[in-house]
Amino acid sequence: MTLLRACVLCTLVLPFPLSTLAQAPDSTDTYGEQVQLPEITVEAVRSAETEATAPFAVTVRTRSPEEISLTSSTSLDDVLRPLPGIWVNDRHHFALGERISVRGVGYRSNFGVRGVQVLYDGIPLTLPDGQAFLDVVDPAVVRQVELVRSPASVFWGNGSGGVLFLSSSRPGTAPSNRVRVQSGSYGQWQGLLEGGGSVGPWTVHGYASGQRQDGYRAHSQGYRLRAGGTASRSLGPDTHLRVMLAADQQDTENPSSLTREQFESDPSQARPAFVNVNAGKQSSQVQLGATLDHDLGGATLSGTAYALRRVLDNPLNFAFIRYTRWSGGTRLTLRRSQGRVQGGLGIDAGLQSDDRTEFTSTTPRGTPGDEIGLNQLETVLNGSAFGYVRFNATDRLSLTGGLRIDRIRFEAEDRLTRDGDQSGTRTFSAVSPSVGLSFDTGSGQLFAQYSTAFETPTASELSNRPGGGGGFNQEVDPQRTRGFEIGVRGTVAEARLQYDASLYRLEVDDLISAYEDAEGREVYDNLAANTHDGIEASLTWQATPGLEVAARYTGSRFVIEEASDSSLVGNRVPGIPSRRVYLHTEVSNDGWWGRLSGQGVPSYYTNDANTAEAPRYVLVNLTLGHKGIDTRGLTLKPFVAVNNVLDERYAGSVVVNAFGGRYYEPAPERSFSAGLNVVW
């Protein structure tokens, strides 16, 4: 990191001019509340704990009204970047979505999300096979984020190396009505209509949005439409119902990744092989869910049912992939949150059905070729049961323990039998324990935990057999993780500080690793064993009611300990930087609100052999807006934003172990945007 970049990053934590701070703060600011650990129930662990008392690393981040209205929020990276322990890669096109990893878990994913359980408004986006697609999530309406950084299979089973719980609204509340428009560099445009209120006995919240871009890179044009909402009501003094709906439709081009030489010479170019077949994605997804809570007096019984339908056409240079997916599930939980002994019991069931067809080629128009290479029906069945107990040994000391049993069955019905019937099954089972303790120090909390996670290969990973063909890859098995952590969180009220720190070690056996063959197809195997050691720290200083300074540090050492290829032993796990520093300063004064943020990332490896690296960078973003100008019953909230202020050339994402050294997915140069909210 150059001296200039380091100096710029350091200035982010320096106060703005004292004359600004000396002016009167906005009357809506609350001074004392900023430095207290909130008693927020952590829904990401099925309401078993609160943020202040949890015996594991968890962050609950509630986005302020100013952040929701006055920042661009076009990508989940904008929402998740301030959180420690999570690594988000933004590809800056719609075809593949963000690449998300928590403590190194999920690093192998080059499309979708692996290894991290994701829920949106209480409904799982993670499928029974362990993969998640976040297309339906509109970052512009996400109001609260819960991130459990510890392995959490005891609560959610398959693919729970961490838990990400996203909420567009809080139960029983509805945001103001607003129309929002935003335009910016590279043909970016976004429109949003959002509103809510009471409709008879219902409290409702709904939104609809459209987004399009020409894109910084060639062949990255696309559009997407989203809609969703929640509705809740009481069915009696002890019973509450909440319904959730979300939908997405998109049509986008895919520029693919570049070699280092291409990245250095012209990062805006696209891979010619993808342009030649008009590679991209056309998809739609709809999901619906409902949760019913009933208070039994000292205990709560909760039941949830949900369903999802996703349709995909995916033209690529080596194949044209088409599938229709149906998925759904139920969960039932009984929990007790009073008394010396607390805890819960639950059962889950899930079903996933993928009707998959792969054509062996794609035409220059982006349509499927004539020959079918794979035609099969893939079914995933998942059943599980779990229990969790918390024993409050004293007023300050609590002990916790949990256990979950899962069984998952994958079935492939081969409907293309010219080369023989390759139908097959894979069945996996797991027992996931956890134990922990927490100690209340008065102003903070000490905690320690041992927890576990397991992660099966997904249906698409099993169907990507080396050499092609139907059925499932019989050589790749689940990976299993054991996690150890200690930490502390709390406040220093006199100094108006809030802090959070944790040390952890993950031991990963039978690590599922991805590599790309010559045609560009992802193929998977078990690498062997990794260790992930790390530290995470957060500090937030509410200097005045109108000035907040925050710092986040994530340090890690992820090492390949065992491998079938002995030359890889001792190498660093690719795709994840060893350090990440995030800083921001927020100022609110006389109706104006501004944020200056920065993220520093060193170079990091892009392949298992550690022979190639993504370049280091410092990313600085600036936003300025007004919190409300009243005009004839309407409130106007304008804003402007500058991203990549330093005009860095960097890779927003990487493709781990890509064939031919095509690791790099470039991010845009300096860009500008402006928007307006009209609120009533």
What do these predicted regions represent?
Residues 183-212, 217-255, 279-298, 328, ...:
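Transmembrane beta-barrel wall of Gram-negative outer-membrane proteins
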Residues 127, 136-180:
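A beta-strand signature from Gram-negative outer-membrane beta-barrel systems
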